[in-house]
Amino acid sequence: MNQYYITECIANENASNIPLHIYTVSLLNLNQKYSFVHHIVYELRKRNANVTIAAHGQYIASFQEIVHWGDHKYIKHEYRAIECSNAAERTVLERLLKQELIERCKNEYKIYKDLFCLKTEQSIEMNEIIVHPAIYLSFTVEENGNILIGFEYQHRFEYKKTLEDLLRDRSPLIKEGVEVVDSYNKKSYYYTFVEVAPYTAGEKSPYLQQSVIDYYITKNETWKLKGVHNKTPIVHVRSQNGDIFPYLPHLLRLTCSYEQLMPSTAQQVNRIIKLPPNEKMPKLYQEIFRLLQYQNMLTFRKENVRAANLNYDIFNLSPPLMEFGRNYKTTKVSDGLGQAGVYEPKSITVSYFVDPELNYDPRKKDEILDFTKKLQHLSEKLGVKLNVSKNRVSYLGYCPFDFFKSERLSFELKSIADAFDGTVIVIGTEENIDRAYMAIKREFGAKADIMTQFVIFDSSVVKNLYYQYNVLLGIYAKSGVQPWILSDEMNSDCFIGLDVSHEHGKHASGIIQVIGKDGRMIKQKSIMTAEAGETIANRTMEEIIDESIFSYEKMYGMKPAHITFHRDGVCREDLDHLTRYMQSFQIPFDFIEIIKRPRRRMAVYTNGRWFTVQGLCYAKERMAYLCATDPRESVGMAQAVKIVQKTKCLSIRDVVSDAYKLSFMHIHSMLKTRLPITVHYADLSSTFHNRGLIHPRSVHEQALPFV
């Protein structure tokens, strides 16, 4: 018999029965309320060494009375349980429970932000990277007082070389704003790098009013001065609160995310961190209950990790039928394309832009010519005729051998952009495409509004039929071809994907619209709006709605009966304003949060074996977890998607069903995505817009320039 599990557990205790000391402090500046109260907490922790303290908003809380306040004052002190209907009080209890656990386990665990690393567990060194296995854990207090913990087995990455090593090597990785970590304490401290200080270790620091060497001698931490002399350089780093600290660079390392790893390193790391369910789940449960033994305020039963014991409604969703050419219907993309071709046959114009480094090699040139002929033949079988432009610049010997490596590539591209027609298929070596990608996307895409599809040419894979299908789907996506639609209708008429991309302090909205019950993409548009933080402004939302309804009416001759908004991440938008604006159209709607990485895993256990099931869903009230994929064991364990319904129009089952069906509309690839394409494409759209890779007034509104 199947048993359904999740990496979540409910405490035996209820928040309404846990008394704590709650102090309310006066806020001098509402705009700085978070930094202000955390400054107070920092001082209180130093004065009350054995008391666990947490804060949120204007609340400071502890399970013990805070006796020593120094110069700080509070305006109210209460000893009571929190009001579970009060979101701020729920948050302060969540933080207090987390801090209590950190304080009690810090002798056995190394704490990295939200990660608990066992000191006894061996870190893994791989190339230039150190990998630290860890447990992520979070506390959630619900409005009914239930206390849940969520957990996940994760890894933390940092560079093997210290900041001192990288500075000595003049590494390009060192630049203002990169994250660094001091791992030489019981708790790791994270900062952003600012600069190399204009003074050395033996000179007086304006921030310390003494030299850094004297500072560590005073603190009785002379072990940190090993190898340090008066002329040792000092760096300035900035804390999360904005304070500047002088630091010895050998005490800092650059942090790293998985996405930043070089492909060769990532492949090696995957063999260690991508654990299949049968390895990950038992290890994860063993480690989390070992960690929870240090939590003395709460108790947990091991059987409360079963979805049924957590009051989840458990159900399975079937893959939807998709329609291809000649009304052929199937649940498999490979079957549909192979048997009947694309849903929407048409002719498209393409141009080839070949890396001159390949073109100057006669054997490679012949292989590429053969490859392009096979692409054209296969595409014709699928129902799409590729009309090849005669303006094949690189074939005519126009570009020099090292053209893709040129320091002036952006400038050189300006003079040849007009020579191409239709979608440009850029064929090159992996190294040269990596080098030229951004320049070509900016000059051809953002400035000339030319669609480009990049193809990495590797003799060992280009003959593979699956590879050729993927290349063609990429070309079709750039050319406005609809390869398949959903045969199974959805519960909503119109879907709008929303995202705000944030990079280097810039924020921009993105949008992809999937209009109609068949999942067809009628129009995509990047909204050229710089947003404040991660909130989409009311005026931007109105523009998005106007564009969507107008496009729907143009296609179907009527307004949609229902609209679903898919928001990438947490909703920070003004839903009251959105409701009023939608009422002016008399269209009901649902606003849905799609949380891509909820740090939960779903698994099924039967006959001594753990496994994942595609289409499995755990739902509760207006929230659900969905397992939308079932990857090969070598790839690791499927990641769940969290779906939160902020409105009450459709049922949560209908909402999840629609999101699952839209994960099959990943039309630029043979692989389905675990996300509905509303959110997946909106994410790509806003990121490309933020990086200046999309034309601000593109005429290609049925193409996907960002895939």
Give, region by region, the residue ranges found by the protein language model:
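Extended, highly charged clamp/arch subdomains and adjacent linkers
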Residues: L20, V178-F457, V699-V707
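Long, contiguous domain-sized segments
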Residues: M1-K187, E380, V384-N387, N391-F420, ...
